[in-house]
Amino acid sequence: MSKQLKLFMVAMFAILILAACGTSKEEGTSNSDASNTEEKDVLKVGLEAGYAPFNWTQQDDSNGAVKIQGSEEYAGGYDVEIAKRVADALGKELVIVKTEWDGLLPALESNVIDAIIAGMSPTPERAEVIDFTENYYTSNFVIVTKAGGDFADAKTLADFAGAKITSQLNTTNYAVIDQIPDVKKETAMESFSHMRVALESGVIDGYVAERPEAISASSANENFTYVELEDGFKTDPADTSVAIGLRKGDENKDKINEVIKAITEEERQELMDQAIANQPAAK
């Protein structure tokens, strides 16, 4: 083989290698761009899917439920209806990410989810870590107890003296139990479904909840009732309101606030009434 032919073949081989590298790079860039586009086209919302009537898990898409990411189950409830309105306004596909309560803030901060719509109150402590929108629901604290039980006719906090009371871990609901004189404050529980089981079995005498959850519990179980206190818990307005949690500096915050402000109080109550009626245990 001549020297010139050898040089020609080496040059051609080098050109082929460079062309292949260029194609690979372009494909990688293309795949990356596609992935980024997909991320921008969805709104990943974190919630427990276990806090009816705000959010729950069900087996089908009835009543507007949305499929849970990575699951054959669906999420429904008041929070899901709010999330659907927000996603529509942002022009994004709603993706529900089922997340334990204590995992919601870490999931938001680590970009696993884009928003928390989970009946979360915008407390000052949480606001140090994440941003909150305008409130999308406001309620009050009540105590769920056994119908016909020792505390069913209670009128004041003092009437619950000696009662075994609990609520959810890392919530204001649990903190306000300290306002009950001589209460037996039980260990906080992970979810309200656990509290319902504990109340039914007599492990506790009651638990502190927001009024919608109390209505939900008593609607689902005729053995439960709830007490609205004449002289109730002393709370900050932020403790009984719920808002959407966002990462600090989220560019969509103003747009989301517009969506929330457009929902009238009457509409909010209608959505909550529908959620209470549609919760799986109420059927």
Model-derived regions: residue spans:
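Periplasmic-binding protein-like
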Residues: 138-147, 219-260, 278-283
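Short, low-complexity, disordered segments immediately C-terminal to signal peptides
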Residues: 22-41
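Short helix-initiation/N-cap motifs at beta->coil->alpha
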Residues: 78, 96-108, 152, 187-197, ...
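A ligand-binding cleft/hinge motif common to bilobed small-molecule-binding domains
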Residues: 120-128, 176-179, 201, 205-238
